[in-house]
């Protein structure tokens, strides 16, 4: 899980990587 700063929940494991 990567910490995305796109406004989504960073605590949620997502397979999409937001840069």
UniProtKB/Swiss-Prot annotation:
Record localization: Cytoplasm
Cellular compartments per GO CC: cytoplasm
GO biological process: defense response to bacterium
Signal sequence, renumbered to the chain: none
Keywords on record: Antibiotic, Antimicrobial, Cytoplasm, Protease inhibitor, Serine protease inhibitor
Cited function: Serine protease inhibitor. Displays antimicrobial activity against the Gram-negative bacterium S.typhimurium ATCC 14028. Displays no hemolytic activity.
Name of the protein: Kunitz-type serine protease inhibitor 1
UniProt organism field: Xanthosoma sagittifolium (Arrowleaf elephant's ear)
């Amino acid at each position: 899980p990567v910490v995305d700063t796109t406004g989504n929940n960073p605590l949620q494991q997502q397979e999409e990587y937001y840069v």
